Amino acid sequence: MNAYQNKNITIIGLGKTGLSCVDYLLSQQANIRVIDTRKKPTGIDKLPQNIPLHTGSLNQEWLLESDMIVISPGLAVKTPEIQTALKAGVEVIGDIELFCRAATKPIVGITGSNGKSTVTTLVYEMAKAAGVKVGMGGNIGIPALSLLNEDCELYVLELSSFQLETTYSLKAAAATVLNVTEDHMDRYMDLEDYRQAKLRIYHNAEVGVLNNEDKLTFGEGENQARQTVSFAENSADYWLKTENGKQYLMVKDEVILPCEEVTLVGRHNYMNILAATALAQAVGINLDSIRTALRHFKGLDHRFQLVHQANGIRWINDSKATNVGSTVAALAGLYIEGKLHLLLGGDGKGADFSELAELINQPHIICYCFGRDGVQLAKFSSQSYLFETMEQAIEFLRPTLQSGDMVLLSPACASLDQFASFEKRGEEFTHLAQYSA
């Protein structure tokens, strides 16, 4: 008899992740109920008809009758109904915990405020180039539980702080917290509360890959890996060498690749490459395979992506910059011949925007602010314009563009005040950029 057979388990949240929990727990012969606080949740048409479903609110009676609750990462454990269930002795976990209990192959775990998806995909491509049967999922692509149905020798998981809050059995072969900057301050008490959720990835990890430029990423207490390696621009195991005007990606004294041979550009991307290389080497991927993957990797959509170039003007879609730290990373070390037309705005999730002030208060940077927190953002630039929508901002700036200029959507905010997702925001920007031709 398995651990879940005949257990009363309530799954909170439908969508792809919730449905993966349903499929997995049905295969384990559990008694399942599903709750979704939305009245018409996505995925409702894919739920087997014999599964009891409650929508529109949290059903406290169902929660208290459960042996276990599998909670969506989108719902805080601090929610009163969940706290009541916990106090009554009900176990509360997430889908990643279910996965970790079942997985028998090594796991690479990646978290951080920014760069998670790029690093996760890089490690996946490096493993593939080495001929490893590798599965990628978690907070990117397919739900982690769906990977159990695949023939994998290695799992590469992107993990959010929300997912890590309800994960207890992760024993990563290699893990990293790429960086810690303010994000989701509408859910966490403060930056330290958010950081502690991230650091859980190091609990029982074999190798921790540390960002030597960000001490907030260092493990502490029980959340420390058994061994550590580091990455940074200088003074680290994986580092960036500058010689005769050229930059090189290095591991100790060995050249990984000259930066000019990789398609990703920008200092923040070089740091992502170093972190990914460290993780890949920690699980036995050889440098030749790593080099092959790096030469072919084109980057991900909506991450500092060149979507249009004409008349000497570049349009860059960085819609995935949903927090201040991501926009700071995009702006750091950015060289522009002409003016930078920076599009900022959306839902700031309670973040402090003041870190942007020094970076954006430059003679060559003009800010175009929009969305829910556009007014707040506009205060930090002496050259700012305020609009209701991104489209209005672009139509305003379009006639002013000259050769050498860059239009950069790096909003420092989430998109949900005006768009269905950051992807939809990026797609609209791309459409408007290409319309300018």
From Swiss-Prot:
Entry annotated with the keyword DNA damage: no
A single GO cellular-component term on record: cytoplasm
GO molecular function: ATP binding; UDP-N-acetylmuramoylalanine-D-glutamate ligase activity
Superkingdom assignment: Bacteria
Residues given in the record as ATP binding sites: G112, S113, N114, G115, K116, S117, T118
Entry similarity comment: Belongs to the MurCDEF family.
Cross-referenced HAMAP family: MurD
Protein name listed in UniProt: UDP-N-acetylmuramoylalanine--D-glutamate ligase
Species: Haemophilus influenzae (strain 86-028NP)
Source species taxonomy: Bacteria, Pseudomonadati, Pseudomonadota, Gammaproteobacteria, Pasteurellales
